């Protein structure tokens, strides 16, 4: 589970991260990262948001995918800068893959992001 201070909850945060952040795709997830987006909000630490649409499956399947994504995102909080905003969008294939593969894809995305990610 992600701590409350590290969760994105406002749609404006999601919109800004998706619109102005850098996108990296993998077979089962798409990651949007916006670095240094809100300098006055750094004390809260990095924030992570999930997008798991109906294309992923039934409500039970979507919630399962969301739980697994939260679980794999939590250890990566230490690698992010305090002002970073991260949105993870689950693709339909994420419903059938293992948590280990989701973690591997997320780590691969974050490693390949340019240092100054964000527009």
From Swiss-Prot:
Its EC number is 3.1.26.5. Keywords: Endonuclease, Hydrolase, Nuclease, RNA-binding, tRNA processing. The keyword Nuclease applies. GO terms for cellular component: ribonuclease P complex. It catalyses: Endonucleolytic cleavage of RNA, removing 5'-extranucleotides from tRNA precursor. GO terms for biological process: tRNA 5'-leader removal. GO terms for molecular function: 3'-tRNA processing endoribonuclease activity; ribonuclease P activity; tRNA binding. It is an enzyme of class 3 (hydrolase). SUPFAM superfamilies: Ribosomal protein S5 domain 2-like (SSF54211). It holds the Pfam family Ribonuclease_P. Belongs to the RnpA family. Consists of a catalytic RNA component (M1 or rnpB) and a protein subunit. HAMAP family: RNase_P. This is Ribonuclease P protein component. The gene is rnpA.
